[in-house]
């Protein structure tokens, strides 16, 4: 078993790490404070090929693998959880769905500009009364000639206010439950489509999280992904991949907080010696280190399995569950190690702790991941 990264994967890490340190980190606190979407950096990410890492060059991508993409999310999240999830939602949820389930025409029209970073992607599944219970969709699509008319809404949509291309789900047959759900590609300029409420959040404050509103929205029939009534399996498979992205975000946030705590402990002195010389505090860091490394192996394994075309649903659930737990634990301990300073905005660990919380919630709560894992244990 080879645990070494390939030369290409190491180069991706180096490139993204330099970008994160030079471009993302300097504005991370400011965009969090002002809730400003970092469009300038997202455009640069497109220019550097980050928005299409796992997609073939034929479709405008970088021709990399899933682990290279996961490493990119991890490195960005070390300094800014917001930027990490912008990339994750764009790649794992929107572009990857089109890449895996779209027609050749859909790939050429929508995947190519997404992979090149010319367009930003988003994914719309969650509704006011359909969170974990995705089958309780109320959004309805009715076929009328050469188009569908869609009415309804989606909430908590990452990249919602800035995306150009969305994949959404709607009921085409309300009598069939989940077997009546279909998937559609929509564009921000479609008639009847508008952005509703813009959410104000505890963490990842610079990401655009919004409501999507559909009022007699016209969607061409050729924009359906897959067959009518086959949207639910597509949604669930896509979330499996998305969970690896969120696990990578959680891993990166934990690593970022760990790095900040380590640096602080070396410079901060109490009772005539630096904090790293206090055994109790040093052992806290040892526990954090072990937790981070165990999360890394779960995340990387899930990415490897996805790339290899092997079953990865349970591994993605394990990775997300554990990495999210680690992110909350490590960031909380980092704040504690900083003492009173950790509770202020003078240091980034309070932001990292706020950013970490959402990793236990979106793309399947920690409780949902336990359902997936326990289902395998007892089947």
From Swiss-Prot:
Keyword vocabulary terms for this entry: FAD, Flavoprotein, Oxidoreductase
Reply yes or no: does the keyword Transmembrane apply: no
Broad class of enzyme this protein falls into:
oxidoreductase
Q: What is its EC number?
A: 1.3.8.1
The protein's superkingdom reads: Bacteria
Q: Could you give a GO molecular-function term held by this entry?
A: flavin adenine dinucleotide binding
Q: Which cofactor does it need?
A: FAD
Q: What is this protein called?
A: Acyl-CoA dehydrogenase, short-chain specific
Task: Tell me which species this is from.
Answer: Clostridium acetobutylicum (strain ATCC 824 / DSM 792 / JCM 1419 / IAM 19013 / LMG 5710 / NBRC 13948 / NRRL B-527 / VKM B-1787 / 2291 / W)
Q: What is the lineage of its organism?
A: Bacteria, Bacillati, Bacillota, Clostridia, Eubacteriales
């Amino acid at each position: 078993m080879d645990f070494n990264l390939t030369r290409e994967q190491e180069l991706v890490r180096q490139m993204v790490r330099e970008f994160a340190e030079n471009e993302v980190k300097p504005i991370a606190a400011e965009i969090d404070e002002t809730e400003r979407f970092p469009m300038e950096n997202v455009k640069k990410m497109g220019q550097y090929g980050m928005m299409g890492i796992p997609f073939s060059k034929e479709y405008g991508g970088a021709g990399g693998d899933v682990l290279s993409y996961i490493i990119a999310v991890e490195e960005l999240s070390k300094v800014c959880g917001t930027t990490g999830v912008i990339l994750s939602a764009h790649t794992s949820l929107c572009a990857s769905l089109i890449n895996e389930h779209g027609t050749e025409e859909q790939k050429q029209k929508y995947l190519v500009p997404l992979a090149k970073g010319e367009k930003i992607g988003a994914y719309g599944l969650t509704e006011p009364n359909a969170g974990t219970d995705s089958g309780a969709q109320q959004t309805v699509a009715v076929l009328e000639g050469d188009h569908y008319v869609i009415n309804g809404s989606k909430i908590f949509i990452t990249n919602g206010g800035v995306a150009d291309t969305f994949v959404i789900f709607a009921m085409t047959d309300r009598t069939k439950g989940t077997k009546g759900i279909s998937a559609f590609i929509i564009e921000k300029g479609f008639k009847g489509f508008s952005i509703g409420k813009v959410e104000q959040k505890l963490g990842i404050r610079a990401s655009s999280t919004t409501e999507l509103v559909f009022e007699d929205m016209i969607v061409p029939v050729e924009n359906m992904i897959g067959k009518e009534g086959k949207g639910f399996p597509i949604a669930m498979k896509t979330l499996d991949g998305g969970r690896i992205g969120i696990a990578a975000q959680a891993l990166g946030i934990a690593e970022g907080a760990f790095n900040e705590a380590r640096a602080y402990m070396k410079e901060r002195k109490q009772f005539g010696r630096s904090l790293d010389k206090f055994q109790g505090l040093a052992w806290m860091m040892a526990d954090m280190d072990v937790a981070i490394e165990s999360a890394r192996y779960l995340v990387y394994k899930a990415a490897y399995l996805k790339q290899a075309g092997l079953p990865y649903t349970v591994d993605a659930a394990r990775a997300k569950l554990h990495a999210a737990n680690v992110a909350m634990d490590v960031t909380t301990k980092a704040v504690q190690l900083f003492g009173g300073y950790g509770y202020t905005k003078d240091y980034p660990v309070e932001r990292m702790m706020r950013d970490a919380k959402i990793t236990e919630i979106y793309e399947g709560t920690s409780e949902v991941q336990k359902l997936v894992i326990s289902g395998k244990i007892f089947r």
